[in-house]
Curated annotation (Swiss-Prot):
PROSITE patterns hit by this protein: ABC_TRANSPORTER_1, ABC_TRANSPORTER_2, CBS
Source organism: Listeria monocytogenes serotype 1/2a (strain 10403S)
Keyword Magnesium: no
Protein name: Glycine betaine/carnitine transport ATP-binding protein GbuA
Effect of inactivating the gene: Mutants are impaired in the transport of glycine betaine at elevated osmolarity and at decreased temperature.
Record's catalysed reaction(s): a quaternary ammonium(out) + ATP + H2O = a quaternary ammonium(in) + ADP + phosphate + H(+)
Domain ABC transporter: 28-264
Means of activity regulation: The complex is activated by an osmotic gradient or by low temperature.
Gene it is expressed from: gbuA
Domain CBS: 279-335, 340-395
Amino acid sequence: MSKIKVEELTKIFGKKASKASSLLSQGKSKTDILKETGATIGVNKASFSVEEGEIFVIMGLSGSGKSTLVRLLNRLIEPTSGKIWLDGKELSSLNKKELLEVRRKSMSMVFQNFGLFPNRTINRNVEYGLEIQGMDKEEREKNAAESLALVGLAGYGDQYPSQLSGGMQQRVGLARALANNPDILLMDEAFSALDPLNRKDMQDQLLDLQDKMKKTIIFITHDLDEALRIGDHIMIMRDGSVVQTGSPEEILAHPANEYVEKFIEDVDRSKVYTASNVMIRPEIVNFEKDGPRVALKRMREAGTSSVFVVKRNRELVGIVHAAEVSKLVKENITSLETALHRDVPTTGLDTPLAEIMDTISTTTIPIAVTEDGKLKGIIIRGSVLAALSGNEVNVNA
C-alpha cells in the first residue's frame, strides 16, 4: 500500500468554481477558463502515489501548481474535488480535530522562507511545534537537541537566528520539522533561496538524513538538476496538470512530450545515470580454472581481444588479453596465472557516471561493474556515449 495516494485532485480558485469545473471537463485550457470565468485552475485532476521512505519530487516552472498541490496534501488549502489517502485513510473524511492531529504528528513542512522567530533561541525555535502540542519542557528540549545534532548544528542551540548563515538557518527549519518525528516531510522550495554551494550542502544533508531515517519526503522544486539529484521519482507539472511521472532515468530516457524534452535538453546526464544504467552484459567470461586454450577459443569465437576471469560464483578475479594468452598456448603453459591482470578498473552499480568519466576516458579495457565482488556487467565507451546522447542502452547486449 502506498504511503500517499492522490486521485483526480483538483483546486479551482475563484467564485465561479462550478462553471470552471464544467469547462475543465470539456477540455478547455487554463487560459480560456480564466478569460471566461475569472477562475484560476491551481491543480487539474492530479493523480499519483508516493511510496513509504522515498523522496518524491514535484517540479515545474512558476505557476505550474506544484506549491498549491503540496498544500492540498495537508489541507492547508481545501481541494475543489478529488481524493487524498494517507496510509489508506481518506483525508476529506477527517474532522477538524483529526486533521489537526495529522498535521501535528504525521506531516511537517519546510518552507523556502525559514520562518524562524528572531526573538527565540535556536533551541526554542526547534521546540516550538512541540511546545504547541503541550509536550513537557524536558522532553521537548531533548527532542530539539537530537534534531539539531541530526542536521549538524549540535552546540548552536543557545544562539539566535541572526547569528547563523542562511544555510544554517535552513538547517534549523529542517530540524524543527524533524523534531516531532513525522512520517512525512513536505518541503516547498526548501533550498531555493540558498546560494549554489549551500544548496548542494543541504541536498547532501537531506540525502544523509534519508539514509538514516527513511522518511517519506515530498520535495517541491523548479530546479531540474536538484530534482534529478535527490528524487527517487519525479513528477513534472505544467499549468496545474501532471505531465509525466517516473524515475530520473525514465524521464531522461523517455520524455513524455516536447515540453519534457525541452525541459531536460540541457541536463548533464552523467550526474544522473549510474553504472547500472550504462553497463552491458559481457559476451563471454572465462572461469578461473579454465586454461589458456579455452580462454583463447572463447575470445576468438566472440571476436574480442580480452576476457574477464571469474570464479564459479562470478566473483571477479581479473582480465586476460588474447596476445598474452596466445603466447602461453604456444609455450604449452596450462595455467593463465602469468597472463592474469588482477588490477582492473571496477565500479559499483550505483556509482554516478560523472565519478568514473576520467577512468572511462583513459582506460583501454572495459570497466568491471561489481556487487559484493561479483561481476554484474561491463562498461565500454560506446554504451556511455549512447547514454549521454540520449539513446537507450541495452544492458543485455
